[in-house]
Amino acid sequence: MGGMNDLSSTPAPEGDRPARQRKPDWIRVKAPVSKGYHETRKLMRELNLNTVCEEAACPNIGECWTKKHATVMILGDVCTRACAFCNVKTGMPRIVDPMEPENTAIAAAKMGLQHIVITSVDRDDLPDGGAGQFVKVIEALRRETPDTTIEILTPDFRGKMRAAVEAICEAGPDVYNHNLETVPRLYPTIRPGARYYASLRLLEEVKSHDPMIFTKSGIMLGLGEQRLEVHQVMDDMRSADVDFITMGQYLQPTPKHAKVEDFVTPKAFDAFGAIARAKGFLQVASSPLTRSSYHAGDDFAEMRAAREAKLAKERERAQG
């Protein structure tokens, strides 16, 4: 946990800034300038909604917002934790906005979204960790845009996990995402406020409560992890029956965040993706610019089709 009065996105003083690595050509993206980008930004401002696209300085924001895709970040824009990789502000959060669920549904309707991703900051200050707000958002979306599929990306609800997962699963999201973020060895420095095996248990709990909810998890590469450690994370996810794995390049948001140890090549990402598919994931996204919600709608459609094909084969064998 960071100091409650510090903001994690505040730059370090000039003299304290270490040299930053130059990004390779495959990691560079165009600056966002399109009409669609500005329309999406304007709508989010009008509805007083936060997006992880902006708060986490996502490199894909130009592409996604041009297509009017956005990941809404609920429960405010201040996190109660201070992970070494994350650009979201940390400190004492504000009161939860009661209009957030309705405004999220309005945004989804105005943007004509077929698939929406909802995430949040950590809210260790709330009795339920913020689970109730996830439920309200899902319910508002079901009322206002019943044909929109819903993907949620939640924190670990430390100390409140079981009740939180049960409440959210009862609300019926289509995809439940919770990121492991990195390999277990790096948790003390990269994700000190969380526990690797607690996050795995959360993913298991989702499947235990409702096996038909797709589960998804992701890790960042380039933080100093070893190849075999990544393979082990894949195995751990499959043991928890995770359907979809995402793997992307870690990018240092500011000089005070964890440094990039390695820029993993596109070829290496392809190799990790092939290994993940061989391990039985229904869906795999593995590339330098892959992020949790990047192409989420298309990926969901492919994952659903893959499960339907798998179930059809199982029925054929059972009848055979």
UniProtKB/Swiss-Prot annotation:
Keyword S-adenosyl-L-methionine: yes
One GO cellular component term: cytoplasm
EC number: 2.8.1.8
Keywords: 4Fe-4S, Cytoplasm, Iron, Iron-sulfur, Metal-binding, S-adenosyl-L-methionine, Transferase
Subcellular localization: Cytoplasm
Domain Radical SAM core: 65-282
Pathway given in the UniProt record: Protein modification; protein lipoylation via endogenous pathway; protein N(6)-(lipoyl)lysine from octanoyl-[acyl-carrier-protein]: step 2/2
A Pfam family matched in the record: LIAS_N
Compositionally biased intervals (Basic and acidic residues): 14-24
Residue ranges of the region described as Disordered: 1-24
Binding site residues for [4Fe-4S] cluster 2: C79, C83, C86
Highest taxon listed in the record's lineage: Bacteria
Gene Ontology terms for molecular function: 4 iron, 4 sulfur cluster binding; lipoate synthase activity; metal ion binding
Binding sites annotated in the UniProt record for [4Fe-4S] cluster 1: C53, C58, C64, S293
Catalytic activity: [[Fe-S] cluster scaffold protein carrying a second [4Fe-4S](2+) cluster] + N(6)-octanoyl-L-lysyl-[protein] + 2 oxidized [2Fe-2S]-[ferredoxin] + 2 S-adenosyl-L-methionine + 4 H(+) = [[Fe-S] cluster scaffold protein] + N(6)-[(R)-dihydrolipoyl]-L-lysyl-[protein] + 4 Fe(3+) + 2 hydrogen sulfide + 2 5'-deoxyadenosine + 2 L-methionine + 2 reduced [2Fe-2S]-[ferredoxin]
UniProt cofactor note: Binds 2 [4Fe-4S] clusters per subunit. One cluster is coordinated with 3 cysteines and an exchangeable S-adenosyl-L-methionine.
Cofactors, names only: [4Fe-4S] cluster
Bias-annotated ranges (Polar residues): 1-11
Family statement drawn from the similarity comment of this UniProt entry: Belongs to the radical SAM superfamily. Lipoyl synthase family.
NCBIfam families, A to Z: lipA (TIGR00510), PRK05481.1 (NF004019), PRK12928.1 (NF009544)
Protein name: Lipoyl synthase
Source lineage: Bacteria, Pseudomonadati, Pseudomonadota, Alphaproteobacteria, Sphingomonadales
GN (gene name): lipA
